[in-house]
Regions:
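C-terminal membrane-cytosol helix-exit motif in multi-pass small-molecule transporters
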Residues: 196-214, 231-241, 260-274, 510-517
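Transmembrane core module of solute transporters
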Residues: 30-94, 99-102, 113, 117, ...
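Helix-loop-helix hairpins in multi-pass membrane proteins, especially solute transporters
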Residues: 86-225, 252, 411
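Transmembrane alpha-helical cores of Major Facilitator Superfamily
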Residues: 44, 76-80, 107, 161-165, ...
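Small-residue (Gly/Pro/Ala) motifs that create kinks and tight helix-helix packing interfaces
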Residues: 57, 170-182, 432, 436-440
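Cytosolic juxtamembrane N-terminal segment immediately preceding the first transmembrane helix
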Residues: 2-42, 46
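Short helix-capping/hinge motifs at transmembrane helix termini and TM-loop junctions
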Residues: 120, 152, 208-211, 244-245, ...
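Hydrophobic transmembrane architecture of multi-pass small-molecule transporters
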Residues: 11-21, 25, 70, 200, ...
Length: 535
């Protein structure tokens, strides 16, 4: 009876149809291991690509004969397209099936990566990055869904742990790998490396999951909802990516983008909540656990990712680190994250996920507090210690929050829920990065002004330093050197302000997570029931 009105309504609301086929049993033995590796590899490749190009922008821009400012469209174009298609995962899954959609997305991601490497102009590269971002959207939510379906209910926490491990480590590894490839080879190779990796991931995924397809339904296309989604998300992402460059709301372009985004978002909410077949299931937010879980995850990830972006910027611009060296400072975060994430997955079967999240946020707060004591004389060992400790928090916050957001959900709604959750996470990361980089500049200007009140011509310290420098430099260069020292101190103090604020936010988030009421009837706090139903 596919295609009936009742089934279409079920598809739109996320409810399971009355005559749903029996769920697939969990995978066993080698099949589960191979399937998990294949899915994790695809996720790692996808998430890595969101950050690997960041440190290569100067090289790409120079090779294509454009400015670094124009080169940032390589990042913006991917982010906009990706943000639009991620929340469409639930609807696309109902049309094409989980396995088919995941394989199509992975193979198209490989193709567009190859095209990006062959691009000979900025215009061509931006077009291919738009296509790459668009096809990448469903990969992360569906990898989570398929991973959950591979494990028995009592091991759902472990499934989430394996998935989260690759999702969190990849953004940290991206700048390190991107810098190394750009320095050692040429920038197209940051895209070419996806080809063999993606093909292997797709082939093994097909071998393991080809007979585990989810049911499909011929539901109508919500054209108005799709159009409004494209407009408000696209305008928002461009505004966030270009806001600092255009001086935010002093620019008519940013003001226009903000107005368009807000108006389109309001109409999108109204339309999707009244449409019989919405393209995005906003009714998921009627669930307390989903709302609190997604909100907490979004805020925490926004602060976490903003700090991930800020550290390399500070190290490269004001501490004299190369891109590769800055990557080595941030890379150790993956040490404890990789080792402890499986442990957290096992703990989730017996512990209240809110306790694990609270522990993670307190560790994040400790790390931020430690960083707030940095200075320009800090050696690499001093910088690395908080990074290593942060890996403990990474292992303990992402998996339990995902379990909370899925707790109590009908299995048929998991793809849509995962898509919305990941959309909120990615958008929060963009918000956090834009807000943090803007605050960094603003607070640096404040500190520079305060420092200049002390270090100015006529003050003993300034005059002494100036006379010393004049022995080897002309007056203009001596003044420029002193101003450079003030800038370094000002931006360092500004970074410390942000680290301190991050610590406060993480402490406050410990209260927010306790507003959730995860179902404790299942082996993993209710998340296992939702996850296990995805089989």
């Amino acid at each position: 009876m596919s295609g009936t009105t009742a089934e279409r309504q079920d598809a739109a609301t996320g409810a399971a149809p009355a005559a749903a086929p029996a769920p697939h049993p969990p995978l066993e033995g080698a099949a589960r291991i191979i399937g998990s590796i294949a899915l994790s590899t695809a996720v790692f490749m996808n998430v890595l690509d969101t950050s690997i190009a960041n440190v290569s922008i100067p090289t790409i821009a120079g090779d294509l004969g454009v400015s670094s400012s124009q080169g940032t469209w390589v990042i913006t174009s991917f982010g906009v397209a990706n943000a639009i298609t991620v929340p469409l995962t639930g609807w696309l899954t109902q049309r094409f099936g989980q396995v088919r959609l995941f394989l199509m997305s992975t193979l198209l991601f490989v193709l567009t990566s190859w095209l990006c490497g062959f691009a000979s102009s900025l215009e061509a590269l931006v077009v291919f990055r738009v296509l790459q971002g668009a096809v990448a959207g469903p990969m992360i939510p569906l990898s989570q869904t398929l991973m959950l379906a591979s494990f028995p209910r009592e091991k759902s926490g472990m499934a989430l742990a394996i998935w989260a491990m690759t999702t969190l480590v990849a953004p940290v590894a991206g700048p390190l790998l991107g810098g190394w490839i750009s320095d050692t080879y040429t920038w197209p190779w940051i895209f070419y490396i996806n080809v063999p990796v993606g093909l292997l991931a797709a082939w093994f995924s097909w071998r393991i999951y080809k007979d585990r397809e989810s049911p499909t339904r011929h539901i109508p296309i919500d054209r108005m909802g799709l159009a409004l989604l494209v407009v408000w998300v696209g305008a928002l992402q461009v505004m966030l990516d270009k806001g600092q460059e255009l001086d935010w709301f002093s620019s008519p372009v940013i003001v226009t983008l903000a107005v368009v985004s807000v108006v389109a978002f309001v109409f999108f909410l109204i339309w999707e909540l009244t449409e019989a077949h919405p393209i995005v299931d906003l009714r998921l937010f009627l669930g307390r656990n989903f709302t609190i879980g997604v909100l907490t995850l979004a805020v925490a990830y926004g602060v976490f990712f903003a700090n991930v972006v800020l550290m390399p910027l500070w190290l490269q611009r004001f501490m004299g680190y190369t891109a590769t060296d800055a990557g080595w400072v941030t890379a150790p975060v993956g040490l404890f994250a990789i080792l402890l994430t499986p442990v957290v997955g096992r703990l989730l079967a017996s512990q209240d996920p809110r306790r694990l999240v609270t522990f993670a946020f307190l560790v994040f707060a400790l790390v931020s507090y430690m960083r707030s004591g940095f200075n320009t004389q800090a050696d690499m060992a001093t910088l690395i210690v908080p990074t290593v400790i942060q890996g403990i928090a990474m292992a303990a916050f992402f998996v339990p929050l995902t379990a909370i957001s899925l707790s109590g959900l009908d299995p048929a709604r998991i793809p849509a829920a995962s898509g919305l959750s990941n959309f909120a996470r990615l958008t929060a990361g963009a918000f956090g990065t834009s807000i943090t980089t803007t605050l960094w500049d603003d607070r640096a200007a404040f500190h520079h002004a305060r420092l200049s009140e002390v270090a100015h011509p006529g003050s003993p310290g300034f005059d002494s330093a100036f006379e010393t420098l004049r022995q080897t430099l002309d007056p203009a260069r001596a003044l420029s050197y002193i101003d450079g020292l003030l800038n370094t101190q000002a931006f360092t103090l500004s970074a410390l302000d942000i680290f301190h604020a991050s610590a406060v936010i993480f402490v406050l988030l410990t209260a927010l997570v306790w507003l959730a009421r995860p179902n404790r009837s299942g082996p993993a706090g209710g998340a296992a029931e939702a996850a296990g139903g995805a089989h």
